[in-house]
């Protein structure tokens, strides 16, 4: 039998199994269809999503039963005048994915599954991001105005920081050490990176993996991009369900103290009034200072260790950093924790002498090779991409103007300080990789 005929026969039998509510047979046939590489029909996709939701519901029920068991044990101990750490474990539940909220985010960001791994994203939650961007632009303007009153060489300082950060366009690693580097970063790359981490946390939430009590280590944290992405996602959910008590412990590991300071300064102005229950701890040191870090970083403590865009172009620094990351995952990630890696397409592919991947299997082999270097096991990955293609359009500027949300409040600052005659748009071209330690 030819493959099309085999696929048709499997699909026919699958439909019959679903109609007769024979879930065991339907599951087996769905697995065979997926393994064959055939594209899933809408009914098969719907059935698969139903299975995933049932699995999440069962997981939630199991956690509730476990919490009830801990509560009974705690009550028993209290009756005997005893108390252990059971109380701390009762609240370790995950946020259960809300269907309407997931639909809202998918629609707002115009998320489209292009293939097994690539998701096109051309939209935004305007209510959340417009307000956030407007406040950010105001924050940057106020800081620069304050500096203009205090110093006579602000233009020179701005040029230093702009020239440094523009090295990214040339495939080099910026120093980020100039006085106004934080301001220029906030102006140029902060919103895109928050946009990406927002979507990364959304994928984790959608998979039912986001705890209500979460300990996060953010390596090379910058101004706290990872915390902002999570904070805005939780803010987005307020119209859809009642948020259970959340507790976010955020550990920022960052070499540049000025980035940490500016990030915390803006957080206090914008995020804290949103009643965000977040505790910050700052470790101002280089990732290459591993000996001292190993003494400070808690052991087997973190639910998520995140590395967002801190992967080097320089080969020697890249190899050294990957070994350090591997050591940190081994020592500081708890037994049930996850590594969340966000890396640009070029920085993932080029070290393996790959310029472009044209199929998912080739892409998967590169991702697995990368994960293996970090001593991790892959859980899943997604390639978030604004253009919906693995090849760039001949005129990306035209595509952006016609399809991507503009940064309405930051663009005037960008035009002024980068001396470029066009607006900038929200966009993403990153791999979001979730992994666990071995």
Give names to the regions the model predicted.
Residues 19, 25, 29-38, 59-101, ...:
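Domain-level detector for long C-terminal conserved domains
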Residues 249-254:
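Conserved SAM-binding motif I beta-strand of class I
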Residues 2-12, 23-24, 39-48:
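Generic helix N-cap/helix-start motif at coil->alpha-helix transitions
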Residues 81-167:
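N-terminal auxiliary segments of SAM/dcSAM-dependent transferases
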Residues 223-243:
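Conserved SAM-binding loop of SAM-dependent methyltransferases across substrates and taxa
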Residues 13-17, 49-55:
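Conserved small-residue packing positions in alpha-helical repeats and bundles
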Residues 212-222:
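Conserved class I S-adenosyl-L-methionine
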């Amino acid at each position: 039998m030819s493959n099309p005929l085999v696929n048709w026969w499997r699909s026919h039998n699958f439909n019959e199994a679903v109609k007769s509510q024979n879930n065991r047979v339907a599951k087996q046939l769905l697995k065979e269809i997926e393994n064959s590489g055939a594209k899933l029909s809408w009914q098969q996709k719907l059935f698969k999503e139903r299975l995933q939701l049932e699995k999440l519901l069962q997981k939630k029920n199991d956690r509730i039963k476990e919490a009830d068991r801990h509560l009974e044990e705690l009550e028993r101990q209290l009756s005997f005048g005893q108390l252990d750490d059971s109380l701390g474990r009762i609240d370790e539940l995950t946020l259960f994915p809300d269907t309407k909220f997931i639909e809202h985010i998918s629609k707002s960001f115009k998320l489209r599954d292009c293939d097994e791994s690539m998701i096109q994203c051309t939209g935004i939650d305007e209510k959340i991001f417009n307000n956030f961007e407007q406040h950010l632009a105001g924050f940057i303007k106020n800081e620069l105005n304050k500096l203009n009153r205090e110093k006579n060489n602000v233009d020179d300082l701005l040029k230093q920081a702009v020239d440094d950060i523009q090295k990214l366009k040339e495939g080099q690693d910026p120093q980020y050490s100039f006085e106004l580097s934080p301001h220029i970063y906030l102006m140029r790359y902060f919103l895109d990176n928050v946009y990406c981490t927002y979507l990364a946390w959304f994928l984790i939430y959608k998979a039912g993996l986001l705890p209500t009590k979460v300990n996060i280590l953010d390596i090379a944290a910058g101004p706290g991009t990872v915390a902002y992405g999570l904070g805005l996602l939780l803010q987005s959910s307020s119209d859809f369900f009642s948020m259970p008590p959340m507790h976010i412990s955020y550990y920022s590991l960052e070499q540049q103290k000025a980035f940490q300071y500016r990030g915390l300064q803006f957080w206090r102005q914008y995020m804290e009034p949103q009643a965000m229950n977040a505790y910050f701890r700052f470790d101002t040191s280089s990732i290459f200072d591993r000996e001292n870090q190993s003494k400070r970083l808690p052991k087997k403590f973190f639910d998520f260790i995140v590395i967002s865009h801190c992967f080097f172009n320089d080969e020697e620094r890249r190899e050294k950093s990957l070994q350090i990351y591997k050591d940190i995952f081994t020592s500081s990630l708890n037994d049930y924790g996850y590594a969340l890696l966000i890396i640009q397409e070029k920085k993932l592919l080029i070290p393996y002498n790959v310029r472009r991947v044209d199929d998912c299997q080739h892409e998967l082999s590169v991702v697995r090779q990368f994960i293996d270097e970090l001593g991790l096991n892959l859980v899943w990955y997604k390639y978030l991409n604004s253009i919906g293609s693995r090849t760039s359009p001949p005129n990306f500027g035209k595509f952006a103007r016609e399809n991507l949300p503009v940064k309405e409040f930051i663009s005037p600052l960008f035009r002024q300080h980068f001396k470029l005659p066009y607006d900038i748009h929200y966009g993403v071209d990153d791999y979001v990789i979730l992994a666990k330690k071995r």
